[in-house]
A protein has these predicted regions:
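Pyridoxal 5′-phosphate
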Residues: 1-329
Length: 329
C-alpha cells in the first residue's frame, strides 16, 4: 500500500463536504463524477505508455482480468488454450481456473508446471497468454516486449498484469504491442486502500472486443434505460456498474504525482536503493539464514526486494512494531 498523497485529503474533503453533502446528485455532472473512470484513465495512460482512449479506471484487478481474458478469447476463434505462469499472483490463477471450469472446452497451461518456458507451451491452440510484468513474490522483471512478440508470432493475444510495475517502472503498453492490460492503483500509484483498478484495451481491438460483464455504465445510452444492451463505443464499453466515487476522488492525487515524475529517474534511484538494501542485509544478517529471493541483477528486478528466512512473519511483526513497514508473503 503506497503512502497517502497530501492532496488526497483535499480531494476527499471536497468530495464529501461539498460535492456530496451540498450538491448531492447534481455532482454526477457538475463535479464530473460520471466521467471520473474515463478522466482518471486518461491521466494513467502516459504513466503506462498508452495513447489516449485506451484506459478506463474501473472495478478490481480480478474483475478486469476476467473481462479481458473473456474478451480476448472471443477474438481468438478456433483457439481454446490459456497460458499463464504457475507463480502468478493467486487471484490471476483463480480467475483462469474459473473460466476453464465454466467453459469445458477451454484449457489452461502454466509455465513452470506444464512446461519450462512460454515457447514450449505455444501452439496453434493457444488463444491468450497472460503474464505479470513483475513477479509479486520475487520481484523478477520479465522481458515483456520479447514475450509479446513470441505470443503474436504464435497467433495469440497477450494480456499484461502491471500491478507491481505501474508508477515505479517504465511501462510501454503501446510500444510493446500489448493487446490488453490490467493493473491496480493502491501500490505505486498511491490510490489508497481498495482504490479501483484499471483496464487497457488496445485501440485496434476496441470496436470488436466485448465486455462479458455488460452493465449499465457500459451501455451506449445508459440514461435511455433501454431493455436491451448496446455496448458503448471504445474503452467505455468495458465499464460495468456504478463506480466508487470517493475512492476515485482519493486516487486522483496519486496519479497526478505519477504524471510529474520521470520514471527513468525513479527506476535508477530504485535500483540504487534496492541494491544498497540487499548489500546491507547480506552484510548484517548473513548469520541468520536469510536468503535473497529476488534477482541479483538489478536490470532483472522490479522495485521490490524479497528475502526468505525462518519465522518470517514474526520478524515482520517485530519490524512493524518499530515503525518499519514490510510485507510478509
Amino acid at each position: 500500500l503506497g503512502p497517502m498523497p497530501k492532496k488526497a485529503f483535499e480531494h476527499l474533503e471536497r468530495a464529501i463536504s461539498n460535492e456530496w453533502a451540498e450538491d448531492l446528485i447534481s455532482s454526477w455532472n457538475n463535479a464530473g463524477w460520471w466521467k471520473l473512470p474515463q478522466t482518471l484513465g486518461e491521466l494513467i495512460a502516459p504513466v503506462v505508455g498508452a495513447a489516449s482512449g485506451q484506459i478506463i479506471v474501473s472495478d478490481s484487478t480480478s474483475l478486469n482480468l476476467y473481462k479481458t481474458v473473456y474478451a480476448a478469447l472471443a477474438l481468438s476463434e478456433g483457439r481454446n488454450v490459456l497460458v499463464s505462469e504457475s507463480e502468478s499472483f493467486p487471484t490471476n490463477l483463480y480467475i483462469l481456473e474459473g473460466i476453464t471450469s465454466a467453459q469445458q472446452n477451454i484449457q489452461r497451461r502454466l509455465v513452470g508446471i506444464d512446461g519450462d518456458s512460454l515457447e514450449e507451451l505455444l501452439d496453434d491452440n493457444v488463444a491468450v497468454v497472460t503474464f505479470s510484468h513483475v513477479n509479486y513474490r520475487t520481484g523478477e522483471l520479465l522481458p515483456i516486449e520479447e514475450l509479446v512478440k513470441k505470443t503474436h508470432e504464435a497467433g495469440a493475444l497477450f494480456i499484461l498484469d502491471t500491478c507491481h510495475s505501474a508508477g515505479v517502472l517504465p511501462v510501454e503498453l503501446d510500444k510493446w504491442g500489448v493487446d490488453f492490460a490490467v493493473g491496480c492503483t493502491y501500490k505505486y500509484l498511491n490510490g489508497g486502500p481498495g482504490s479501483p483498478a484499471y483496464l487497457y484495451v488496445a485501440k485496434r481491438h476496441q470496436q470488436v472486443a466485448l465486455n462479458p460483464l455488460s452493465g449499465w455504465w457500459g451501455h451506449a445510452s445508459p440514461f435511455a434505460f433501454e431493455k436491451d444492451f448496446q455496448a458503448a463505443e471504445g474503452i467505455l464499453r468495458f465499464q460495468t456498474g456504478t463506480q466508487p466515487i470517493l475512492s476515485l476522488r482519493g486516487l486522483q492525487a496519486g496519479i497526478e504525482i505519477a504524471q510529474t515524475v520521470d520514471l527513468q529517474m525513479v527506476r535508477k534511484k530504485s535500483q540504487r536503493l534496492t541494491q544498497l538494501f540487499i548489500e546491507l542485509v547480506e552484510r548484517r544478517c548473513g548469520n541468520y539464514e536469510v536468503a535473497l529471493q529476488s534477482p541479483t541483477d538489478p536490470e532483472k528486478r522490479g522495485s521490490q526486494v524479497s528475502f526468505h528466512c525462518l519465522n518470517g512473519f514474526s520478524i515482520i511483526q517485530a519490524l512493524i512494531a518499530r515503525k518499519i513497514i514490510a510485507d510478509f508473503r
